[in-house]
Amino acid sequence: IPMENQIRKQATVGVFAVGHAVYWGQFPGLLDKLMIYHADFVKLLEKQGVKVVDFGMSDSSERAYEMLDRIKASGVDLLFCNMVTYATSSVFAPIARDSGLPIVLTALQPLANLDYTQANTRMQLENDCICAVPEYMGVAARMNRKIYDVIIGCLYNDEKADGEIAKWCNIAKALHGLK
């Protein structure tokens, strides 16, 4: 077999953020802020030597179904669900059930510590990344779909979380090599 036929393109990971569309009208600017955090997460993935396909925000069940079609057509090797705020499982369940991909949940809050003397609902929603993890895990279990990992930590300057992201990107590379 000629060497050029043995060379494979780089691994591709998919990523999508989850949110709750009801919040956008209640908290002007929240969606934009969360998408900045999502873009920063995408940059963390890109540093790992993988191609990244960003599917954007799933914030309703309708959007989840629309996104699912794009995910299935993309050929990604692994999928990250970026939990940027609380979101109902309806924005995640169709993707988990029908994508056929290994999924890793990421719950990386932007702030290392919340200033509870200044706390408000908006601040909570910007850092509420872990809240829906039990709900998502339960939904996946009821659908007999495995969630391969949950990466919990801070979005910025968190070596442990960065290491876990690197591990899963390396797993995506291995999965790609098996294709």
What residue spans do the PLM features occupy?
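An N-terminal assembly and electron-transfer interface module characteristic of large anaerobic redox
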Residues: I1-K179
